[in-house]
Protein backbone atom coordinates (compact mmCIF):
# COMPACT_ATOMS: atom_id res chain seq x y z
CA UNK A 1 0.00 0.00 0.00
CA UNK A 2 1.43 3.34 -1.05
CA UNK A 3 1.35 6.18 1.47
CA UNK A 4 0.50 9.39 -0.35
CA UNK A 5 1.07 12.93 0.85
CA UNK A 6 -1.94 15.22 1.30
CA UNK A 7 -1.10 16.84 -2.07
CA UNK A 8 -1.05 13.42 -3.77
CA UNK A 9 -4.35 12.47 -2.11
CA UNK A 10 -5.87 15.61 -3.64
CA UNK A 11 -4.43 14.67 -7.05
CA UNK A 12 -5.78 11.12 -6.69
CA UNK A 13 -9.30 12.46 -6.10
CA UNK A 14 -8.92 14.85 -9.04
CA UNK A 15 -7.60 12.13 -11.37
CA UNK A 16 -10.45 9.77 -10.44
CA UNK A 17 -13.02 12.49 -11.12
CA UNK A 18 -11.50 13.31 -14.52
CA UNK A 19 -10.74 9.80 -15.77
CA UNK A 20 -13.49 7.53 -14.40
CA UNK A 21 -15.23 9.91 -15.05
CA UNK A 22 -17.40 10.79 -12.06
CA UNK A 23 -18.53 14.08 -10.57
CA UNK A 24 -16.93 15.14 -7.30
CA UNK A 25 -20.40 15.09 -5.72
CA UNK A 26 -21.05 11.51 -6.83
CA UNK A 27 -17.59 10.47 -5.61
CA UNK A 28 -18.49 11.99 -2.24
CA UNK A 29 -21.74 10.01 -2.31
CA UNK A 30 -19.79 6.81 -2.96
CA UNK A 31 -17.46 7.53 -0.05
CA UNK A 32 -20.43 8.32 2.19
CA UNK A 33 -22.08 4.99 1.35
CA UNK A 34 -18.92 3.12 2.38
CA UNK A 35 -18.67 5.18 5.57
CA UNK A 36 -22.33 4.61 6.42
CA UNK A 37 -22.04 0.85 5.90
CA UNK A 38 -19.03 0.74 8.21
CA UNK A 39 -20.83 2.72 10.92
CA UNK A 40 -23.95 0.55 10.67
CA UNK A 41 -21.79 -2.57 11.09
CA UNK A 42 -20.67 -1.22 14.47
CA UNK A 43 -23.76 0.56 15.90
CA UNK A 44 -27.47 -0.21 15.58
CA UNK A 45 -30.08 2.39 14.66
CA UNK A 46 -31.04 2.62 18.32
CA UNK A 47 -27.85 4.65 18.83
CA UNK A 48 -28.40 8.44 18.88
CA UNK A 49 -26.00 10.11 16.43
CA UNK A 50 -24.57 13.63 16.59
CA UNK A 51 -22.71 14.78 13.48
CA UNK A 52 -20.23 17.66 13.59
CA UNK A 53 -19.47 18.85 10.05
CA UNK A 54 -16.84 21.35 8.98
CA UNK A 55 -17.10 23.74 6.02
CA UNK A 56 -14.96 21.69 3.61
CA UNK A 57 -15.29 18.36 1.85
CA UNK A 58 -14.81 16.38 5.06
CA UNK A 59 -17.91 18.19 6.27
CA UNK A 60 -19.63 17.31 3.00
CA UNK A 61 -18.87 13.63 3.63
CA UNK A 62 -20.31 13.98 7.14
CA UNK A 63 -23.54 15.61 5.88
CA UNK A 64 -24.02 12.81 3.32
CA UNK A 65 -23.44 10.19 6.04
CA UNK A 66 -25.97 11.97 8.28
CA UNK A 67 -28.59 11.81 5.51
CA UNK A 68 -27.97 8.11 4.85
CA UNK A 69 -28.04 7.17 8.53
CA UNK A 70 -31.34 9.03 8.96
CA UNK A 71 -32.79 7.18 5.96
CA UNK A 72 -31.88 3.93 7.74
CA UNK A 73 -33.78 4.87 10.88
CA UNK A 74 -31.09 6.53 13.01
CA UNK A 75 -31.94 9.53 15.17
CA UNK A 76 -29.46 12.10 13.81
CA UNK A 77 -28.61 15.63 14.93
CA UNK A 78 -26.31 17.69 12.71
CA UNK A 79 -24.16 20.70 13.56
CA UNK A 80 -22.64 22.38 10.49
CA UNK A 81 -19.90 24.93 11.18
CA UNK A 82 -20.20 27.82 8.71
CA UNK A 83 -18.74 30.70 10.70
CA UNK A 84 -17.19 32.41 7.65
CA UNK A 85 -20.22 31.73 5.43
CA UNK A 86 -17.98 29.80 3.06
CA UNK A 87 -18.79 26.15 2.38
CA UNK A 88 -17.10 24.06 -0.31
CA UNK A 89 -19.33 23.41 -3.34
CA UNK A 90 -19.91 19.75 -2.45
CA UNK A 91 -20.52 20.54 1.20
CA UNK A 92 -23.10 23.12 0.11
CA UNK A 93 -24.77 20.57 -2.20
CA UNK A 94 -24.98 18.00 0.60
CA UNK A 95 -26.37 20.65 2.95
CA UNK A 96 -29.24 21.15 0.47
CA UNK A 97 -29.81 17.39 0.10
CA UNK A 98 -29.89 16.99 3.86
CA UNK A 99 -32.37 19.83 4.36
CA UNK A 100 -34.55 18.56 1.51
CA UNK A 101 -34.72 15.13 3.17
CA UNK A 102 -36.19 16.74 6.33
CA UNK A 103 -35.21 13.78 8.48
CA UNK A 104 -32.59 15.24 10.81
CA UNK A 105 -32.34 17.93 13.47
CA UNK A 106 -30.11 20.50 11.74
CA UNK A 107 -28.21 23.41 13.27
CA UNK A 108 -25.92 25.70 11.28
CA UNK A 109 -23.28 27.41 13.39
CA UNK A 110 -22.47 30.93 12.24
CA UNK A 111 -21.42 32.46 15.57
CA UNK A 112 -21.12 30.73 18.93
CA UNK A 113 -22.32 27.22 19.64
CA UNK A 114 -24.21 26.04 22.67
CA UNK A 115 -22.95 22.45 22.38
CA UNK A 116 -25.33 19.50 22.69
CA UNK A 117 -25.10 17.11 25.61
CA UNK A 118 -23.09 14.04 24.74
CA UNK A 119 -23.50 10.96 26.90
CA UNK A 120 -22.11 7.43 26.85
CA UNK A 121 -24.91 6.27 24.52
CA UNK A 122 -24.16 8.97 21.93
CA UNK A 123 -22.23 8.31 18.74
CA UNK A 124 -20.37 11.36 17.46
CA UNK A 125 -19.48 11.49 13.77
CA UNK A 126 -16.42 13.70 13.42
CA UNK A 127 -16.39 15.42 10.04
CA UNK A 128 -14.80 18.73 11.00
CA UNK A 129 -11.53 18.49 9.05
CA UNK A 130 -9.90 15.88 6.83
CA UNK A 131 -6.57 15.14 5.19
CA UNK A 132 -6.16 18.65 3.79
CA UNK A 133 -5.56 20.22 7.22
CA UNK A 134 -2.13 21.92 7.34
CA UNK A 135 -2.10 23.78 10.66
CA UNK A 136 -3.19 23.14 14.26
CA UNK A 137 -6.80 23.80 15.16
CA UNK A 138 -7.48 26.96 17.13
CA UNK A 139 -10.38 29.04 18.44
CA UNK A 140 -13.87 27.58 18.29
CA UNK A 141 -12.81 24.40 16.50
CA UNK A 142 -10.20 23.67 19.16
CA UNK A 143 -12.82 24.28 21.87
CA UNK A 144 -15.24 21.93 20.08
CA UNK A 145 -12.61 19.19 19.89
CA UNK A 146 -11.86 19.52 23.60
CA UNK A 147 -15.57 19.37 24.40
CA UNK A 148 -16.00 16.14 22.39
CA UNK A 149 -12.88 14.59 23.94
CA UNK A 150 -14.08 15.36 27.46
CA UNK A 151 -17.44 13.68 26.83
CA UNK A 152 -18.09 9.94 27.33
CA UNK A 153 -19.44 9.62 23.76
CA UNK A 154 -18.06 7.19 21.19
CA UNK A 155 -16.46 8.99 18.23
CA UNK A 156 -16.13 7.93 14.59
CA UNK A 157 -13.72 10.08 12.58
CA UNK A 158 -14.15 10.38 8.82
CA UNK A 159 -10.84 9.77 7.02
CA UNK A 160 -8.66 11.16 9.83
CA UNK A 161 -9.36 12.51 13.34
CA UNK A 162 -9.96 16.25 13.11
CA UNK A 163 -6.86 18.19 14.09
CA UNK A 164 -4.46 15.40 13.11
CA UNK A 165 -2.40 16.29 10.05
CA UNK A 166 -1.63 13.79 7.33
CA UNK A 167 2.15 13.86 7.69
CA UNK A 168 4.09 15.74 10.36
CA UNK A 169 2.45 16.51 13.71
CA UNK A 170 5.67 17.42 15.55
CA UNK A 171 4.45 20.96 16.16
CA UNK A 172 0.76 20.21 16.49
CA UNK A 173 -1.25 21.09 19.59
CA UNK A 174 -2.12 17.62 20.82
CA UNK A 175 -4.96 18.75 23.08
CA UNK A 176 -6.72 20.02 19.94
CA UNK A 177 -6.95 16.67 18.15
CA UNK A 178 -10.02 14.42 18.26
CA UNK A 179 -9.53 11.15 20.14
CA UNK A 180 -11.58 8.77 18.03
CA UNK A 181 -13.02 5.42 19.01
CA UNK A 182 -12.90 4.37 15.36
CA UNK A 183 -11.22 6.03 12.38
CA UNK A 184 -12.58 5.19 8.93
CA UNK A 185 -9.87 6.28 6.54
CA UNK A 186 -10.56 6.41 2.83
CA UNK A 187 -8.66 4.25 0.33
CA UNK A 188 -5.21 4.36 1.98
CA UNK A 189 -3.55 4.94 5.33
CA UNK A 190 -1.85 8.26 5.93
CA UNK A 191 1.72 8.62 7.18
CA UNK A 192 0.68 10.06 10.54
CA UNK A 193 -1.40 6.93 11.19
CA UNK A 194 1.79 4.84 11.32
CA UNK A 195 3.38 6.89 14.10
CA UNK A 196 3.17 5.48 17.64
CA UNK A 197 2.55 8.87 19.24
CA UNK A 198 -0.62 9.32 17.14
CA UNK A 199 -2.27 6.01 18.05
CA UNK A 200 -4.07 7.68 20.96
CA UNK A 201 -6.14 9.68 18.44
CA UNK A 202 -7.03 6.93 15.97
CA UNK A 203 -8.72 4.31 18.14
CA UNK A 204 -9.38 1.33 15.89
CA UNK A 205 -8.41 2.01 12.30
CA UNK A 206 -10.23 0.70 9.23
CA UNK A 207 -9.36 1.41 5.61
CA UNK A 208 -12.38 1.74 3.30
CA UNK A 209 -12.03 1.12 -0.44
CA UNK A 210 -13.94 3.85 -2.28
CA UNK A 211 -12.64 2.77 -5.71
CA UNK A 212 -10.29 5.65 -6.40
CA UNK A 213 -8.25 5.32 -9.60
CA UNK A 214 -6.04 2.24 -9.50
CA UNK A 215 -4.21 3.56 -12.55
CA UNK A 216 -3.13 6.66 -10.61
CA UNK A 217 -2.22 4.61 -7.53
CA UNK A 218 -0.10 2.15 -9.53
CA UNK A 219 1.68 4.77 -11.66
CA UNK A 220 2.36 7.43 -9.05
CA UNK A 221 5.74 7.37 -7.33
CA UNK A 222 5.74 7.93 -3.60
CA UNK A 223 8.36 8.00 -0.89
CA UNK A 224 6.61 5.75 1.61
CA UNK A 225 4.69 2.50 1.36
CA UNK A 226 3.46 -0.34 3.56
CA UNK A 227 4.81 -3.73 2.51
CA UNK A 228 2.07 -6.34 2.36
CA UNK A 229 2.23 -10.07 1.77
CA UNK A 230 1.81 -9.68 -1.99
CA UNK A 231 4.90 -7.44 -2.04
CA UNK A 232 6.96 -9.88 0.02
CA UNK A 233 6.04 -13.25 -1.49
CA UNK A 234 7.92 -12.68 -4.81
CA UNK A 235 11.13 -11.94 -2.87
CA UNK A 236 11.30 -15.48 -1.47
CA UNK A 237 13.92 -17.58 -3.27
CA UNK A 238 13.14 -21.13 -4.27
CA UNK A 239 15.40 -23.74 -2.72
CA UNK A 240 17.20 -25.98 -5.21
CA UNK A 241 16.74 -29.71 -4.81
CA UNK A 242 20.52 -29.93 -5.18
CA UNK A 243 21.26 -27.41 -2.41
CA UNK A 244 23.88 -28.27 0.20
CA UNK A 245 25.13 -26.42 3.26
CA UNK A 246 27.92 -24.81 1.26
CA UNK A 247 25.48 -23.35 -1.26
CA UNK A 248 23.05 -22.04 1.38
CA UNK A 249 25.41 -19.48 2.85
CA UNK A 250 27.94 -19.16 5.65
CA UNK A 251 26.99 -16.63 8.35
CA UNK A 252 29.03 -15.20 11.21
CA UNK A 253 27.47 -13.70 14.34
CA UNK A 254 29.58 -11.75 16.82
CA UNK A 255 27.37 -11.60 19.88
CA UNK A 256 27.17 -12.18 23.60
CA UNK A 257 29.26 -11.23 26.62
CA UNK A 258 29.33 -12.55 30.18
CA UNK A 259 25.73 -12.59 31.43
CA UNK A 260 24.36 -11.93 27.92
CA UNK A 261 24.93 -15.27 26.23
CA UNK A 262 21.18 -15.50 25.60
CA UNK A 263 21.44 -12.78 22.95
CA UNK A 264 23.96 -14.89 21.06
CA UNK A 265 21.78 -18.00 21.43
CA UNK A 266 18.71 -16.21 20.05
CA UNK A 267 20.48 -14.56 17.11
CA UNK A 268 22.26 -17.81 16.19
CA UNK A 269 19.10 -19.94 16.36
CA UNK A 270 17.18 -17.39 14.28
CA UNK A 271 19.94 -17.33 11.69
CA UNK A 272 19.83 -21.11 11.39
CA UNK A 273 16.01 -21.15 11.23
CA UNK A 274 16.18 -18.68 8.35
CA UNK A 275 17.90 -21.32 6.28
CA UNK A 276 21.57 -20.37 6.39
CA UNK A 277 23.63 -23.45 5.53
CA UNK A 278 26.25 -22.83 8.20
CA UNK A 279 26.33 -20.41 11.13
CA UNK A 280 29.38 -19.57 13.22
CA UNK A 281 28.95 -17.80 16.56
CA UNK A 282 31.93 -15.80 17.83
CA UNK A 283 31.52 -15.32 21.58
CA UNK A 284 33.64 -15.06 24.76
CA UNK A 285 35.15 -18.24 26.20
CA UNK A 286 32.86 -18.18 29.23
CA UNK A 287 29.86 -18.77 26.93
CA UNK A 288 31.24 -21.98 25.39
CA UNK A 289 29.15 -24.55 27.26
CA UNK A 290 25.95 -22.52 27.09
CA UNK A 291 26.26 -22.08 23.33
CA UNK A 292 27.34 -25.67 22.68
CA UNK A 293 24.35 -27.04 24.58
CA UNK A 294 21.78 -24.45 23.41
CA UNK A 295 22.66 -24.40 19.70
CA UNK A 296 24.39 -27.68 18.76
CA UNK A 297 23.91 -26.90 15.05
CA UNK A 298 26.21 -23.85 15.24
CA UNK A 299 29.98 -23.72 14.88
CA UNK A 300 31.61 -21.93 17.83
CA UNK A 301 34.52 -19.55 17.50
CA UNK A 302 35.80 -18.48 20.90
CA UNK A 303 37.20 -15.04 21.65
CA UNK A 304 40.61 -14.81 23.34
CA UNK A 305 38.93 -13.16 26.33
CA UNK A 306 36.78 -14.93 28.90
CA UNK A 307 33.92 -12.43 29.12
CA UNK A 308 34.05 -9.89 26.26
CA UNK A 309 34.59 -9.48 22.52
CA UNK A 310 38.19 -8.28 22.26
CA UNK A 311 39.57 -8.88 18.77
CA UNK A 312 38.35 -8.54 15.19
CA UNK A 313 37.63 -11.68 13.21
CA UNK A 314 38.68 -12.51 9.66
CA UNK A 315 35.48 -12.51 7.58
CA UNK A 316 36.91 -13.68 4.24
CA UNK A 317 35.21 -17.08 4.44
CA UNK A 318 31.80 -15.70 5.44
CA UNK A 319 28.88 -14.51 3.31
CA UNK A 320 27.35 -12.25 5.97
CA UNK A 321 28.19 -10.81 9.38
CA UNK A 322 25.82 -9.81 12.18
CA UNK A 323 27.30 -7.99 15.16
CA UNK A 324 25.99 -6.47 18.37
CA UNK A 325 23.44 -8.55 20.31
CA UNK A 326 24.53 -8.75 23.96
CA UNK A 327 28.02 -7.54 23.00
CA UNK A 328 28.52 -5.16 25.91
CA UNK A 329 30.12 -1.72 25.71
CA UNK A 330 33.52 -2.37 27.26
CA UNK A 331 36.20 -0.02 25.83
CA UNK A 332 38.24 -3.00 24.59
CA UNK A 333 35.10 -4.23 22.84
CA UNK A 334 34.57 -0.79 21.31
CA UNK A 335 38.08 -0.74 19.81
CA UNK A 336 37.66 -4.30 18.52
CA UNK A 337 34.29 -3.38 17.02
CA UNK A 338 35.51 -0.46 14.91
CA UNK A 339 38.42 -2.58 13.70
CA UNK A 340 35.92 -5.31 12.79
CA UNK A 341 33.63 -2.92 10.94
CA UNK A 342 36.52 -1.42 8.98
CA UNK A 343 37.76 -4.81 7.81
CA UNK A 344 34.40 -6.45 7.09
CA UNK A 345 34.43 -8.00 3.62
CA UNK A 346 30.83 -9.23 3.52
CA UNK A 347 27.32 -7.78 3.97
CA UNK A 348 26.93 -6.47 7.50
CA UNK A 349 24.15 -6.12 10.10
CA UNK A 350 24.78 -3.85 13.12
CA UNK A 351 22.46 -4.02 16.13
CA UNK A 352 22.13 -3.45 19.87
CA UNK A 353 25.40 -2.77 21.73
CA UNK A 354 27.29 -2.29 18.47
CA UNK A 355 24.94 0.64 17.82
CA UNK A 356 25.38 1.90 21.38
CA UNK A 357 29.16 1.88 20.93
CA UNK A 358 28.79 3.90 17.71
CA UNK A 359 26.58 6.34 19.64
CA UNK A 360 29.50 6.97 22.00
CA UNK A 361 31.95 7.30 19.09
CA UNK A 362 29.82 9.06 16.50
CA UNK A 363 32.79 9.99 14.30
CA UNK A 364 33.33 6.28 13.63
CA UNK A 365 30.11 6.16 11.61
CA UNK A 366 31.87 7.96 8.76
CA UNK A 367 34.23 4.96 8.49
CA UNK A 368 31.45 2.43 7.97
CA UNK A 369 31.24 0.66 4.61
CA UNK A 370 28.28 1.42 2.34
CA UNK A 371 25.14 -0.70 2.30
CA UNK A 372 25.41 -1.83 5.92
CA UNK A 373 22.16 -2.62 7.74
CA UNK A 374 21.45 -1.00 11.11
CA UNK A 375 18.49 -2.15 13.25
CA UNK A 376 17.95 0.31 16.13
CA UNK A 377 14.92 0.52 18.36
CA UNK A 378 13.78 4.14 18.97
CA UNK A 379 15.97 4.83 22.00
CA UNK A 380 19.02 3.30 20.32
CA UNK A 381 18.41 5.51 17.32
CA UNK A 382 18.01 8.63 19.46
CA UNK A 383 21.38 7.91 21.02
CA UNK A 384 22.88 7.20 17.61
CA UNK A 385 21.57 10.46 16.16
CA UNK A 386 22.36 12.47 19.30
CA UNK A 387 18.74 13.36 19.63
CA UNK A 388 16.50 13.23 22.69
CA UNK A 389 12.71 13.36 22.97
CA UNK A 390 12.04 13.31 19.23
CA UNK A 391 8.51 12.84 17.98
CA UNK A 392 8.03 9.68 15.94
CA UNK A 393 7.88 11.63 12.68
CA UNK A 394 11.04 13.59 13.50
CA UNK A 395 12.83 10.35 14.39
CA UNK A 396 11.72 8.74 11.14
CA UNK A 397 12.91 11.68 9.04
CA UNK A 398 16.26 11.73 10.84
CA UNK A 399 16.65 7.99 10.28
CA UNK A 400 15.96 8.53 6.59
CA UNK A 401 18.49 11.38 6.44
CA UNK A 402 21.12 9.23 8.18
CA UNK A 403 20.47 6.33 5.81
CA UNK A 404 21.05 8.66 2.86
CA UNK A 405 24.16 10.20 4.40
CA UNK A 406 25.76 6.85 5.26
CA UNK A 407 24.34 5.10 2.19
CA UNK A 408 23.02 2.50 4.61
CA UNK A 409 19.79 0.65 5.33
CA UNK A 410 18.27 1.57 8.69
CA UNK A 411 15.39 -0.43 10.16
CA UNK A 412 13.73 1.71 12.82
CA UNK A 413 11.96 -0.93 14.88
CA UNK A 414 8.42 -0.49 16.18
CA UNK A 415 4.83 -1.53 15.53
CA UNK A 416 5.24 -0.39 11.92
CA UNK A 417 8.98 -1.02 11.62
CA UNK A 418 10.36 1.40 9.02
CA UNK A 419 13.08 0.50 6.54
CA UNK A 420 14.91 3.66 5.46
CA UNK A 421 16.75 3.19 2.16
CA UNK A 422 19.92 4.93 0.95
CA UNK A 423 17.86 6.65 -1.78
CA UNK A 424 15.39 8.20 0.69
CA UNK A 425 12.54 5.71 0.20
CA UNK A 426 10.83 4.30 3.30
CA UNK A 427 9.11 0.89 3.59
CA UNK A 428 6.85 0.07 6.54
CA UNK A 429 6.31 -3.47 7.80
CA UNK A 430 2.69 -4.67 8.01
CA UNK A 431 3.34 -7.60 10.36
CA UNK A 432 4.09 -7.81 14.08
CA UNK A 433 2.23 -7.18 17.32
CA UNK A 434 2.69 -5.82 20.84
CA UNK A 435 3.50 -9.28 22.22
CA UNK A 436 6.86 -8.94 20.48
CA UNK A 437 7.80 -6.08 22.81
CA UNK A 438 10.01 -8.43 24.78
CA UNK A 439 13.73 -8.80 25.45
CA UNK A 440 15.55 -10.68 22.70
CA UNK A 441 13.07 -9.91 19.92
CA UNK A 442 15.59 -7.61 18.23
CA UNK A 443 18.32 -10.25 18.51
CA UNK A 444 16.05 -12.60 16.58
CA UNK A 445 15.63 -10.00 13.82
CA UNK A 446 19.41 -9.61 13.57
CA UNK A 447 19.77 -13.36 13.14
CA UNK A 448 17.04 -13.52 10.51
CA UNK A 449 18.49 -10.74 8.36
CA UNK A 450 22.04 -12.08 8.70
CA UNK A 451 20.81 -15.50 7.59
CA UNK A 452 19.07 -14.04 4.54
CA UNK A 453 22.18 -12.07 3.57
CA UNK A 454 24.27 -15.24 3.87
CA UNK A 455 21.85 -16.98 1.53
CA UNK A 456 22.53 -14.35 -1.12
CA UNK A 457 19.62 -11.97 -0.70
CA UNK A 458 20.45 -8.35 -1.57
CA UNK A 459 20.48 -5.99 1.42
CA UNK A 460 17.22 -4.37 0.37
CA UNK A 461 15.42 -7.69 -0.02
CA UNK A 462 16.94 -9.17 3.14
CA UNK A 463 15.60 -6.21 5.12
CA UNK A 464 12.13 -6.36 3.58
CA UNK A 465 11.78 -10.12 3.85
CA UNK A 466 13.45 -10.23 7.27
CA UNK A 467 11.12 -7.63 8.79
CA UNK A 468 8.08 -9.39 7.38
CA UNK A 469 9.14 -12.88 8.49
CA UNK A 470 10.00 -11.61 11.97
CA UNK A 471 6.60 -9.94 12.38
CA UNK A 472 4.68 -12.78 10.74
CA UNK A 473 6.30 -15.37 13.01
CA UNK A 474 5.33 -13.16 15.96
CA UNK A 475 1.75 -12.90 14.68
CA UNK A 476 1.44 -16.66 14.22
CA UNK A 477 2.89 -17.23 17.69
CA UNK A 478 0.50 -14.69 19.23
CA UNK A 479 -2.45 -16.38 17.52
CA UNK A 480 -1.60 -19.68 19.22
CA UNK A 481 -0.05 -18.48 22.48
CA UNK A 482 -1.50 -15.02 23.06
CA UNK A 483 0.43 -11.76 23.24
CA UNK A 484 0.84 -11.64 27.01
CA UNK A 485 3.16 -14.64 27.29
CA UNK A 486 5.06 -14.28 24.02
CA UNK A 487 8.87 -14.49 24.33
CA UNK A 488 11.64 -14.12 21.76
CA UNK A 489 12.17 -17.88 21.48
CA UNK A 490 8.56 -18.24 20.34
CA UNK A 491 9.31 -16.04 17.33
CA UNK A 492 12.10 -18.43 16.31
CA UNK A 493 9.84 -21.43 16.91
CA UNK A 494 7.24 -20.00 14.51
CA UNK A 495 9.66 -19.00 11.74
CA UNK A 496 9.02 -22.30 9.88
CA UNK A 497 5.28 -21.54 9.83
CA UNK A 498 6.01 -18.02 8.59
CA UNK A 499 8.01 -19.43 5.67
CA UNK A 500 5.23 -21.92 4.92
CA UNK A 501 2.69 -19.08 4.88
CA UNK A 502 4.73 -17.18 2.28
CA UNK A 503 5.22 -20.34 0.21
CA UNK A 504 1.47 -21.02 -0.05
Across the structure, where does each feature detected by a protein language model lie?
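Short acidic-hydrophobic sequence patches enriched in Asp/Glu that either
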Residues: 87-90, 140, 175-178, 283, ...
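A structural motif corresponding to the C-terminal end of an alpha-helix
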Residues: 103-104, 150-153, 405-408
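Internal gly/pro-rich beta-alpha loop/helix module
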Residues: 121-123, 128-222
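N-terminal small/polar loop signature for handling phosphorylated ligands or for N-terminal nucleophile
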Residues: 64-149, 289-301, 310-313
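Short acidic loop-to-helix transition motifs that present clustered carboxylates
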Residues: 112-114, 160-166, 191, 306-308, ...
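Amphipathic alpha-helical segments in well-structured domains
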Residues: 94-95, 141-145, 180, 334-337, ...
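Small-residue (G/A/S/T)-rich helix-start motifs and N-terminal tracts that mark the onset
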Residues: 1-82, 88, 193-348, 352, ...
Amino acid sequence: MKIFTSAQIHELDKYTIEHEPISSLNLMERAAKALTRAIEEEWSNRTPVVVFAGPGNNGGDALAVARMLSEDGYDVSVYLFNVQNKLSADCLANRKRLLDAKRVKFTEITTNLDPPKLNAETLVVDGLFGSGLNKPLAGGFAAMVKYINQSPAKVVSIDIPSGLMTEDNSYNIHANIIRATLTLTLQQKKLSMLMADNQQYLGRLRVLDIRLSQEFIQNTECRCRILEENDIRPLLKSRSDFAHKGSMGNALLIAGSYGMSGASVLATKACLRTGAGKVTAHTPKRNYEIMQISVPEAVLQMDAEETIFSEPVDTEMFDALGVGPGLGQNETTAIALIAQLRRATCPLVIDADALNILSSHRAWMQQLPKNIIMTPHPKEFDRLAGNANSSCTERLMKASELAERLQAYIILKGHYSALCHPDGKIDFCSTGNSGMATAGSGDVLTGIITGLLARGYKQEDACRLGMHLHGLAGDLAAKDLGKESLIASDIIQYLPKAFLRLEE
